[in-house]
């Protein structure tokens, strides 16, 4: 085993691009590199000393719980001993539609605030669920690029100051709204008529520090606004360009590094920690050679100025869609007897890194393994990728044939046949025309992130174990010759589809690409999605039948004007172009994951040591349980919250159950059936001395559920004394 120790640094020096690359990478040169490199851990004495924690740990003013994104409650009324008595206290039904809502409610002074499927924000009496007010934020459909609910993945309450009133800060479409918490009315002094533009679209919950509201954009970048006036104070580009630090790590078109994952704030040091996702386009990097900063990074910014303090990159030149996917968690741990402040980085690759808050240096050594080369002409893979030992990965990137399902002989044979036709391995690049198998595009971790037990330094994170099955195919499509006018279908696409799927059909944020659609979907399947919608896409996008045919023709590349001359696809040069066939998965003949369970997990880490304390299956397939199969776990998207009562609450599974686990042992102590699947992390709060646990339960989206999508919010509590 050969390895090389790197000098002390936050991340490897970026790959600087120069001459035009040769058609294919040299495997011999790659094999000559040391097998391992290491980023050494910071000396314990050099780690940032713990600062006072000023958060009110019994409050829930932000969807992530507090500015540190810990989703922790110090309330203790509900315990391991009485959890069996927990039951629904009230259920709210929005009554304005049915859609997947991914926002954890905010609760302040006995009032709960949450979005609805009908693109409104509601205020409820947190003790009874009675509606107090409702405010629509969908007056301008063109302003909402996702055409879905406001506060997609969170909102925040700011209490105001001596001169300015309290406000709810809500992202919706391409705007940030400031609303009066008492009435829902827009606050006129904020921006124009209560809203201010967010250039790259809203998704994650922002954070307020002093007078600065920090948020991120769906399609990238971070922004600092004056929380009092809505004035834009600064903008940090997540895709480095021009004279930016890291601009040399891109060659060609620059896109991605989306901001849907989330952010957190150190209230003492004035630092914002922001997670940015994968570069674009997904799966193919021939047009974006280099490490592609600040994709797949946690970036620390000075909140008052927006200046970068440090960054830590996980996967470099990502061609697998392995986003750093969740809000960084801020916590305090013990190292060599000292209490120190750290921040986490979670990714779909299954990596969990623990970093010093001030310098970004890792708390535990980071092992990097030599990665294989690509055979795609024009592709340039990073020579090393993370292969961490401590903390152990949530899941291992790649695929091991030893994991093939043994659920039945038929299931095993069906999966073995797929594996025989596929590639797989540690950061295995795509081979043209062959499916590539790896664990990652649905996690590992996901956007729902983790919860922190503040006193102990434990971290609770949900994860998925499903194998992606994705094929990269040569792209022979070329753009329309500008000498000819667009077709009717292209015009419709530009008007109604391009804000989500991007002008060149390459996809945007969480929205998939439509390139190469003719190779993977029939006309009927495309038209069905246009009519019925899918995920966040609304139904009846085009109601006129003739217009639908025009749009399908454009998407399937039929009856279009002549293409621009030039080789290789949609560009004017001869750079090879590719597309991928969508986000497929390795499943058996009955649609179950093609690997051995567990398929979904709740994981507990002790971050003082970096070790896993326990792992418990999360979710089940009821029909398999009835057949006698042990708890399998299931694909999940929801996230956990933890209490001082020793309980971890979590939903997010298609079996539509809400569960509580013992925080010390991982034993499942309680569950309840929801009207629809839970689709966000729960919030914990207290009203008049009574503790509640509330969950958004709408199903739909990637969670699914037999009953969804729906429109419910359900609050649980112990019975009132008789």
Question: Model regions: which residues?
Answer:
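Acidic, proline/glycine-rich low-complexity intrinsically disordered segments
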Residues: 60, 68, 94, 108-111, ...
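Extracytoplasmic electron-transfer domains, predominantly the class I c-type cytochrome c fold
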Residues: 212, 271, 483-487, 491-565, ...
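Bacterial N-terminal signal peptides
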Residues: 7-18
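Periplasmic c-type cytochrome electron-transfer domains
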Residues: 29, 59, 398, 403-420, ...
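Repeat-blade elements of multi-bladed beta-propeller folds
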Residues: 60-64, 99-120, 147-175, 201-222, ...
């Amino acid at each position: 085993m050969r390895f090389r120790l790197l000098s002390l640094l936050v991340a490897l020096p970026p790959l600087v691009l120069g001459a035009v690359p040769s058609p294919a990478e040299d495997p011999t040169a790659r094999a000559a590199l040391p097998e391992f490199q290491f980023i050494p851990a910071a000396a314990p004495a050099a780690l940032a000393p713990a600062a006072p924690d000023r958060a009110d740990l019994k409050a829930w003013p932000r969807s992530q719980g507090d500015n540190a994104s810990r989703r922790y409650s110090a309330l203790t009324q509900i315990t391991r001993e009485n959890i069996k008595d927990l039951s629904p206290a009230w259920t709210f039904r929005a009554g304005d539609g049915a859609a997947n809502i991914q926002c954890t409610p905010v609760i302040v002074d006995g009032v709960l605030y949450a979005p609805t499927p009908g693109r409104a924000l509601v205020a409820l009496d947190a003790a009874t669920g009675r509606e107090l007010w409702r405010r629509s934020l969908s007056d301008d459909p063109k302003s909402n690029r996702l055409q879905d609910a406001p506060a997609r993945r969170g909102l925040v309450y700011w209490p105001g100051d001596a001169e300015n009133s309290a406000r709810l800060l809500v992202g919706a479409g391409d705007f940030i709204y400031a609303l009066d918490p008492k009435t829902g009315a827009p606050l006129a002094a904020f921006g124009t008529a209560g809203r201010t533009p967010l250039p790259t679209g809203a998704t994650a919950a922002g954070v307020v520090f002093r007078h600065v509201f920090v948020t991120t954009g769906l399609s990238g970048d971070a922004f600092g606004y004056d929380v009092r006036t809505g004035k834009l104070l600064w903008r940090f580009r997540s895709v480095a360009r021009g004279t930016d630090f890291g601009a040399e790590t891109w060659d060609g078109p620059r896109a991605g590094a989306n901001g849907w994952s989330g952010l957190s704030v150190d209230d003492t040091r004035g630092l914002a920690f922001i997670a940015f996702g994968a570069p674009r386009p997904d799966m193919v990097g021939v047009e974006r050679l280099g490490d592609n900063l600040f994709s797949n990074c946690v970036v620390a910014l000075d909140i008052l100025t927006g200046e970068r303090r440090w960054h830590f990159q996980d996967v470099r030149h990502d061609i697998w869609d392995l986003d750093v996917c969740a809000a960084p968690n801020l916590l305090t741990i013990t190292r060599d007897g000292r209490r120190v402040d750290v921040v986490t980085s979670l990714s779909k690759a299954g990596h969990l890194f623990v970093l010093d808050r001030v310098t970004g240096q890792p708390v535990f050594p980071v092992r990097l393994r030599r990665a294989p080369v690509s055979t795609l002409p024009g592709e340039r893979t990073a020579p090393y990728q993370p292969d961490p030992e401590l903390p152990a990965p949530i899941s291992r990137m790649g695929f091991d044939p030893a994991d093939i399902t043994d659920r039945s002989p038929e299931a095993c044979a069906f999966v073995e046949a797929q594996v025989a036709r596929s590639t797989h391995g540690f950061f295995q690049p795509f081979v043209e025309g062959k499916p590539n198998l790896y664990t990652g595009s649905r996690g590992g971790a996901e956007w729902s992130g983790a919860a922190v037990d503040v006193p102990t330094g434990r971290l609770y994170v949900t994860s998925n174990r499903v194998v992606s099955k994705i094929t990269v195919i040569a792209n022979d499509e070329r753009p329309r010759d500008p000498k000819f006018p667009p077709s009717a279908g292209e015009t419709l696409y530009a008007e109604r589809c391009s804000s989500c799927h991007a002008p060149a059909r390459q996809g945007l944020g969480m929205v998939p690409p439509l390139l190469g659609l003719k190779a993977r979907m029939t006309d009927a399947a495309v038209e069905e999605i246009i009519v019925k919608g899918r995920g966040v896409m609304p139904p009846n996008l085009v109601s006129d039948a003739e217009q639908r045919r025009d749009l399908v023709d454009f998407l399937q590349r039929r009856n279009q004007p002549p293409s621009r001359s030039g080789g290789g696809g949609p560009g004017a040069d001869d750079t090879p172009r590719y597309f991928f066939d969508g986000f497929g998965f390795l499943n058996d003949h009955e649609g179950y994951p093609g690997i051995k369970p567990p398929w979904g997990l709740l994981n507990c880490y002790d971050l003082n040591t970096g070790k896993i304390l326990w792992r418990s299956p999360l979710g089940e397939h009821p029909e398999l349980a009835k057949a006698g199969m042990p708890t399998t776990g299931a694909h999940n998207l929801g996230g956990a919250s933890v209490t001082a009562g020793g309980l971890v609450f979590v939903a997010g599974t298609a079996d539509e159950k809400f569960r509580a686990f013992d925080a010390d042992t991982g034993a499942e102590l309680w569950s309840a059936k929801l009207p629809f699947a839970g689709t966000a992390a729960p919030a914990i709060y207290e009203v008049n001395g009574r503790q509640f646990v509330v969950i958004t339960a709408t199903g739909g989206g990637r969670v699914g559920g037999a009953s969804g999508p729906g429109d419910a919010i359900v609050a649980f509590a112990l019975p009132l004394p008789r």
